[in-house]
Amino acid sequence: MDNSSTTKQSKEVTEVMIRSFEKDFGNPSSLHELGRTVQNRINDVRGEIAKSIGFSDSEIFFTSGGTESDNLALFGVADARKRDGKQIITTKIEHPAVLEPCRKLEKMGFEVVYIDVDKRGIPILKQYEEALNRKTILVSVMAVNNEIGTVLPIEKMAEMAHDQGALFHTDAVQGFGKINLRGCGADFISISAHKIHGPKGVGAIAVRKGSKINAMMLGGGQEHGIRSGTENINGLIGFGKAVEMAYDGAEHLRLLKRRLLEGLKSEISDIKVNGSEDETISTGSILNVSFLGTRGEVLLHTLESKGIFVSTGSACSSNKKGKSHVLSAIGCSEKEIESAIRFSISEYNTPEEIDITIEKTKAAVAGFRKLGSFR
């Protein structure tokens, strides 16, 4: 139940990777047959990704994952367009892979505007409209929030950015495989394999033709100079298989989340859903709930002892002390933040597992409240 942190690699992905390890040992930059064969195979993966998000094959570039893709978009565009302007716009609920580069860019002399969100996690569009101007070079807004599951209005925000001559980037690491990204209007899209039952250490960035971006990793000029370094062939083969299967379980996820939400609400009192219960603006994979009268971290470990794995927020920043910047941004109180748990579902979860999770969570919460330690 912690699939927003990472997902179990699928059997199908593992099988194609094992075959790839056995035969795909050429360097795709080599001019001989071994190199050409491998290059053709990874170009097939490129095409699979392009088809799934509405880009062309030549607009897909491989990276080591979502963090690198986000960094490349932010630093690469800032470097390429610094003469056009020095303003970047993002939101207060972005992943650290966007927020940390933005803070670095501020130190480098760029102005970064952080747009507020409402209690659902939707950016305040009036504030966004007022911030946009002809000096805005890039807007970076995630497709789906990794803590509360809110689907952000990236198509509308991309259109508004383009009206002012700005480029638009979306971190779609949590959205890929969950929402339709074709026609979303983004100039840059970041995706990651390990969030869709693929291998870790593999990702991609889509770069719309004509969008200014400079390489941040220099060397042999692989990926048409956008990202040097010999490609992770076997990982990319696994990525391609994961992309093929990415959207197969979307409806199953929605049904499981609905079952989990309804069960928790009917069985446990004094809970609060963080984000939105509206399925039209919330992904089917993430449910963030505050169980008032408990502490999320202690509840996490209690559930862990029962074989149920959840989280209290983003795994990428959970080792850092401090409250969730996402829950703070949507207006949660201190008690709501400290008692929050994120459940994140995968297509491999079953209705029976959802029911067990509800039962064990109910027992754990009741035990804490009976003790009265946190009231």
Segments and roles (model prediction):
Residues 1-375:
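Pyridoxal 5′-phosphate
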